[in-house]
Amino acid sequence: MTKPHKALLLLAFFTLLSTILMAQETGDERAEYLYEKEHPLRETRAVWLTTIGGLDWPRIKATDASSRERQKQELIRILDNYKRANINTVIFQTRVRAALLYPSKIEPWELSLTGKPGQSPGYDPLAFCIEECHKRGMELHSWVVCIPIGTQERQRGYGSASLVKKRPELVKTAKGGEMFMIPGKPETADYIASICKEIVENYDVDGISLDYIRYPESTYNFSDENLYPRASSMSKADWKRENITRIVRRVHDVVKAIKPWVKLSSSPIGKYRDTSRYSAGGWNAYNAVWQDPVYWLKENYQDLLFPMMYFQGNNYYPFLYQWAENSYGHPIVPGLGIYFLDPREGRWTLNEVRAEMHTARNSGIGGIAFYRGEFLTNNCKGIYDTTCDEFFPYPALTARMTWMGDTIAPQAPTSIKYEEGILHWQAPTQITQSNHSYLLYNIYGSNTYPVDVTKAENLLAVNLRDTQWQLNARAQKVRHYAVTAIDRLGNESPAVQEEKPVFELPKHINVPQLINRDVKGTKKTTTGKKTKKKKK
């Protein structure tokens, strides 16, 4: 895109935005008109499910069989609420502060599960969450916090199993007793990659999402510049960015070698760099914490980004546009700080969040993410109702991973039939690609035949793992159905179509008017009207 075209597009973007905001403030009905846009068939709809301190989950500590079951049920209720809102991606905090939510050979159990550091809850929460997400057609991305490992006190609680005891050379204590892994050491990249490798080898995760993949903010007075090679041709700033990129690259190489379809993402600072018109106020990814997520996308080290855009006004919209300009064909899914809807956290209004959601969708950059889950499911200022009714009334597919180079669609399913409220079909008879050996299925339905599988409003269910489906209430209202197969990279097959059987009389048969005898001297037609009986 040329500079003049960019300038015109930017001008149009901000003209539209200012019109929306003015109409919103004045209650002008034009705001609703400007918001109107078809619901997309493909859109990442994500929620960060935060486990540190049990912020979103778990509130119940698993100390015995009864509490363990209640902890599981608590998670099921959360996932059910996500499903009702047509969320399709759950970012599940798996590595918290050098402690994990699964049985590991590398790091200890996270204390939030039982209240005691290093203690097993008696089951595998990561495996359980994956299974429950997949039952509901949702992806699970394992959220890995990379650099911070918590306070000295927290680490002491893990004793000899702590990272501090096992790999002290990788850790440095900063201001306030906060401890961090050292980005300047290449072994740090290897260590974080080993965590991701363990997850991907042992679990059917759909993604690995790296969090805090950056240098600590300046308030911690953290420095590893003593490791900067004096003979380096790079500036110190570029050296720091390379240290962070090395971690991203190492994770990419390890994960993709095992399961190429696993989506790699991160949550960078919400402002990439200062724009030509707007300053990031000293807080951006590139210069403040030495992240270069745009480079990661360019090199395909990452499949998508979830930038933490917990801002308003000129701190949000110009930087959203900046991400859109620098996506290199990858989805950018802005993380919205809906926790600011809570009066204890901020003074955001629902309309402000709606404007951000509409603008993100209209920009076509890839989707929307919410931080964090509790504020969504608690319907803070009506955000859950708005999400369900206005933004996500239908399910959605996630983006195709076209940058992986394989865009060949699988063969269509076969032998579709409807029987007593259940839709059945057969898997494709031919496997044309290696990634087609494991397929999921999408269901579409409408009252017109054939079903148009390009329309979001016809999508009934996504990512089914079985070859049959019990029709839900919405599906029972339509007459025609279609099923597609979809592979791990998001390539979707042609549809196989079926018509729901409905009994209809042949058109050449004349049906006489039915007459019911009522009280003496009258007869009642099917319309319920009474007429006098004629005398003989």
What are the residue ranges of the model-derived segments?
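Substrate-binding cleft of secreted/luminal carbohydrate-active enzymes
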Residues: W290-Y316, H330-M404
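Beta-strand-rich modules
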Residues: W469-E492
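Extracellular fibronectin type III
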Residues: I486-N516
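Active-site-adjacent "subsite" loops/lids of carbohydrate-active enzymes
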Residues: R42-T44, T50-Q73, S142, I147-N202, ...
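Aromatic- and acidic-residue-enriched segments that line the glycan-binding/catalytic groove
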Residues: L100-G115, P148-K175, I213-S232, R277-N284
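Glycoside hydrolase catalytic-domain groove-lining segments
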Residues: R230-Y278, W283-E345
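Conserved aromatic anchor
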Residues: G421-N435
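Catalytic domains of carbohydrate-active enzymes, especially glycoside hydrolases
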Residues: R70-A99, N202-D206
